[in-house]
């Protein structure tokens, strides 16, 4: 069966993404010994990340994270909105909205129906 275009397996979308600091810390760092004093390991790492540079331009660093979450909820990519069908495919859970009636129309409860049992009791 051919891959559906994704570079990662389907189940990786259900796992949490590891933070970049954790993945960088796991890899061994090779430093050339040129006689210069090495910089502290965590001093400039956060300011050199492209995400943090972008958020500094916007202003509040937490603002970009909040806007990303809002975008995910609006586009329906949130995992809360997905369910897995019996075939294993992801389906979007859709909420049914109550339709709004025009002002001139009455709801079925308010309309005068001749076969309405509640009307006879009055």
Swiss-Prot record:
Protein family according to the UniProt entry: Belongs to the PRR15 family.
Biased composition (Basic and acidic residues): 63-76
Keyword Phosphoprotein: yes
Protein name, per record: Proline-rich protein 15
InterPro entries, alphabetized: PRR15 (IPR028237)
Source superkingdom: Eukaryota
Stated role: May have a role in proliferation and/or differentiation.
Keyword Phosphoprotein: yes
Coiled coil: none
Keywords (A to Z) from UniProt: Developmental protein, Phosphoprotein
Comp. bias regions, Polar residues: 46-56
UniProt note on tissues of expression: Exhibits a cell type specific expression pattern only in the small and large intestine and in the testis. Along the intestinal tract expression is restricted to the non-proliferating epithelial cells surrounding the villi and no expression is found in the intestinal crypts, where proliferation occurs. In the testis, it is detected only in post-mitotic secondary spermatocytes.
